[in-house]
Curated annotation (Swiss-Prot):
<dbReference type="GO" id="GO:0004252">
    <property type="term" value="F:serine-type endopeptidase activity"/>
</dbReference>
<keyword id="KW-0378">Hydrolase</keyword>
<dbReference type="InterPro" id="IPR023562">
    <property type="entry name" value="ClpP/TepA"/>
</dbReference>
<comment type="function">
    <text>Cleaves peptides in various proteins in a process that requires ATP hydrolysis. Has a chymotrypsin-like activity. Plays a major role in the degradation of misfolded proteins.</text>
</comment>
<comment type="subunit">
    <text>Fourteen ClpP subunits assemble into 2 heptameric rings which stack back to back to give a disk-like structure with a central cavity, resembling the structure of eukaryotic proteasomes.</text>
</comment>
<comment type="similarity">
    <text>Belongs to the peptidase S14 family.</text>
</comment>
<protein>
    <recommendedName>
        <fullName>ATP-dependent Clp protease proteolytic subunit 3</fullName>
        <ecNumber>3.4.21.92</ecNumber>
    </recommendedName>
</protein>
<dbReference type="GO" id="GO:0004176">
    <property type="term" value="F:ATP-dependent peptidase activity"/>
</dbReference>
<dbReference type="GO" id="GO:0051117">
    <property type="term" value="F:ATPase binding"/>
</dbReference>
<dbReference type="InterPro" id="IPR001907">
    <property type="entry name" value="ClpP"/>
</dbReference>
<feature type="active site" description="Nucleophile">
    <location>
        <position position="101"/>
    </location>
</feature>
<dbReference type="GO" id="GO:0006515">
    <property type="term" value="P:protein quality control for misfolded or incompletely synthesized proteins"/>
</dbReference>
<keyword id="KW-0720">Serine protease</keyword>
<dbReference type="Pfam" id="PF00574">
    <property type="entry name" value="CLP_protease"/>
</dbReference>
<dbReference type="GO" id="GO:0009368">
    <property type="term" value="C:endopeptidase Clp complex"/>
</dbReference>
<keyword id="KW-0645">Protease</keyword>
<dbReference type="InterPro" id="IPR029045">
    <property type="entry name" value="ClpP/crotonase-like_dom_sf"/>
</dbReference>
Amino acid sequence: MPIGTPSVPYRLPGSQMERWVDIYTRLGVERILFLGSEVNDGIANSLVAQMLYLDSEDSSKPIYLYINSPGGSVTAGLAIYDTIQYVKSEVVTICVGLAASMGAFLLAAGTKGKRVALPHSRIMIHQPLGGTSRRQASDIEIEAREILRMKEMLNRSLSDMSGQSFEKIEKDTDRDYFLSAEEAKEYGLIDRVISHPNEA
């Protein structure tokens, strides 16, 4: 039986009354966002809106993005990536559990020096996935060209974010490439491995 989204008590500033709000709303008040599922358009729109709101409220404070995601849609992930680059607030990315595929890309997209992982986290990079079903050959060719274009763009961005050569990124992402938190640090996808919130 699923437990659902937990609720926690929250007192609005200046109020004597407590209200029960879902845990994600309460964390959002503290500028803590959570990517804990596959990346899709709905998740991306929600995270983009929250980052834009928090940035407009106070761009001098960091936004904390916790990531435990198997990855997902490239286009949805790029909307989150572009927003991380767009906002004035520093975006601290924290891997808890797994950051795979687009999840790893977003982990590496955080503010340099502020990309961290917990000790037992796993990070996985690979080339973008594309699938075709019974379609015309010309449509398959168009889709293949677009996937190759996206692959090059993602690999160039990973190269910039990690400091690894484009050629190394291309080779490593040809298949699933798993890294421990320490290995991800050595690779340049994150800056530190942490075990306490004050270290982020």
